[in-house]
């Protein structure tokens, strides 16, 4: 709500001695909104400050899954590095999940263990961060081109055979003639 203070938005009605005694909460507040007055009304903040307050509110929560849309928008490089480190150490190994949509390639490399590319109604999974995704995608594209080249080569041979006219006694199956016409 625009009438809520930054503090109310981030920690709710938790007393200061409770949230301030939690090192994780203190680190999040210091990194993301340390320059924003704790008692400022959210409605008086700039768009970037509001985004950082919202991000702090999410990170303070104890979630098993986080879904973040462009989390690095309105963050400086130091804060982006902090966010990547925080997300990498947020959950114990093998627990927790992060779903992130971003154009920040460095951030993707830092926080992603796997990526999904969505295109033409298809979801292609890739292991690793952005750099690994690029390498794997190039290899998949190369393999797809090789398969298509072989298919086109076979099609050319079949069409050339049909153009010469199949001989009456040739044992070329009818299904191949039909397939070539399709």
Spans of features found by a protein language model:
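ABC ATP-binding cassette signature C-motif
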Residues: 1-148
